[in-house]
């Protein structure tokens, strides 16, 4: 954090009393599974779990202090009326006191990969551990707050990912974060259940630009028809618009990352050329588990694990990657796409038709579809291995992709 790690300093930020002895702490943790000795345990209440139920476990793991909504006799603790609002106040303090460049990345696809590429590139211009990136896909309100708590005095640059699945969420996150660089990777058919259509996605995602500092820069990759809406929110801020291209997603994410670097005052004077070797290194670093991850499975079959999430655009990005591969047999195993609303069946069938133009066989697990094709089958998940057994060899590539709730990563394990 951006303060000396003493409990008394923490309690002053949120104007709460510290009960017990003052002491030093390592960090604030909300999960007893990952916390270490000396951490503070913040007992959050969520829809599925109540952190107060894990207080004894936190103490067993050596928590230096508890932040709770109830008294804990005999222990060192800070009592607050609402632990989530306590977290919010800490996050607000962190943001107000972080005076370095802050980058916020959103978009229908490519947020995490762009963040990873940008992180690897910017590290070259700073000393060790001076660039911060939000962990994993911590892109909702809770994730943003927890990410902000990890900022410390050594950081010279911070890169955050923010997401949405309902109207107003980007506005809420961006107004809290107040970045000086805002990045919109693309506009696509994502979260239509909450955002209705691509126009709703455009309206929601471009809200980021309204909260970029007035002297900051807004970067966006979008079709010509989407630029007017972006301009309305960018106003007099600097802007960089990148064209939508028929290239693989990595190339587009790399181009965006390079454009961001050109906007950073500390870095833009540094010209650098990326060798083929370094680009291959970036490709490996940009791979997030479950996102176009190439694996070698049973009998040397090529597996593409893209099971983390799915929408029509991310399906097509995966199709492009596999189209360029020289394997004899190309198979797509797909599951449902969530949050597409009333257009689910239509968009799903469009994706299936696109898949049939690339793959020799398309297997859909528990999907509804109007598509009739000899190379398309709707099957039960229990029948997947039987249908693919003959393709388990080095001449085959199998793509596995679906929305997160399908848990298709369990199916991928059958073929590893």
Kindly give the residue locations of the regions a language model identified.
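A glycine-rich beta-strand to alpha-helix segment
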Residues: 388, 392-416
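Acidic, Mg2+-coordinating active-site environments of NTP-dependent enzymes
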Residues: 68-74, 181-303, 324-328, 353-361, ...
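ATP-dependent carboxylate/acyl-activation modules
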Residues: 105, 289-291, 405, 409-411
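Active-site beta-alpha connecting loops in nucleotide-dependent enzymes
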Residues: 48, 288, 299, 307-375, ...
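Generic hydrophobic/aromatic pocket-lining and core-packing "Φ" positions
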Residues: 55, 170, 205, 209, ...
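N-terminal leader/targeting and accessory segments in enzymes
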Residues: 1-89, 93, 323-328, 340, ...
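Phosphate-binding loop of NTP-binding sites
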Residues: 8-14, 86-217, 226-235, 386, ...
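Buried hydrophobic packing segments
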Residues: 87, 118, 122, 147-148, ...
């Amino acid at each position: 954090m951006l303060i000396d790690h003493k409990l008394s300093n923490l309690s002053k930020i949120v104007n709460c009393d510290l009960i017990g002895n003052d002491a030093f702490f390592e960090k604030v943790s909300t999960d007893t599974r990952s916390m270490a000795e000396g951490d503070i345990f913040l007992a959050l209440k969520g829809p599925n779990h109540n952190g107060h139920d894990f207080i004894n476990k936190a103490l067993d793991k050596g928590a230096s202090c508890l932040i709770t909504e109830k008294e804990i006799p005999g222990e060192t603790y800070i009592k607050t009326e609402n632990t989530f609002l306590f977290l919010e106040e800490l996050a607000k303090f962190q943001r107000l006191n972080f005076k370095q460049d802050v980058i916020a990345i959103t978009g229908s696809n490519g947020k995490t990969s762009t963040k990873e590429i940008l992180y690897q590139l910017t590290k070259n211009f700073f000393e060790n551990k001076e660039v911060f990136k939000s962990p994993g896909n911590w892109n909702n309100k809770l994730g943003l707050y927890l990410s902000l708590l990890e900022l410390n005095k050594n950081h010279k640059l911070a890169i955050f990912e923010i997401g949405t699945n309902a109207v107003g969420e980007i506005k809420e996150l961006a107004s809290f974060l107040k970045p000086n660089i805002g990045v919109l990777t693309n506009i696509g058919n994502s979260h239509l259940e909450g955002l209705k259509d691509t126009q709703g996605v455009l309206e929601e995602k471009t809200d980021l630009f309204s909260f970029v500092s007035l002297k900051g820069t807004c970067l966006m990759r979008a079709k010509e028809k989407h630029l007017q809406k972006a301009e309305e929110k960018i106003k007099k801020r600097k802007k960089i618009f990148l064209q939508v291209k028929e290239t693989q997603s990595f190339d587009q994410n790399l181009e965006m990352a390079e454009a961001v670097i050109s906007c950073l005052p500390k870095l833009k004077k540094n010209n650098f050329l990326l060798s083929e070797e370094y680009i291959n290194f970036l490709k490996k670093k940009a791979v997030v588990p479950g996102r176009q991850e190439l694996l070698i499975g049973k009998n040397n079959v090529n597996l593409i694990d893209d099971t983390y999430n799915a929408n029509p655009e991310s399906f097509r990005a995966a199709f492009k990657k596999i189209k360029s591969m020289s394997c004899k047999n190309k198979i797509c195993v797909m599951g449902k796409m969530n949050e597409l609303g009333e257009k689910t069946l239509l968009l799903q069938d469009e994706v299936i038709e696109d898949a049939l133009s690339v793959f020799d066989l398309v297997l859909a697990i528990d999907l509804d579809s109007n598509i009739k094709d000899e190379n398309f089958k709707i099957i039960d998940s229990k029948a997947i291995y039987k249908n693919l057994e003959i393709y388990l060899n080095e001449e085959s590539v199998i793509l596995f992709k679906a929305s997160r709730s399908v848990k298709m990563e369990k199916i991928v394990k059958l073929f590893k």
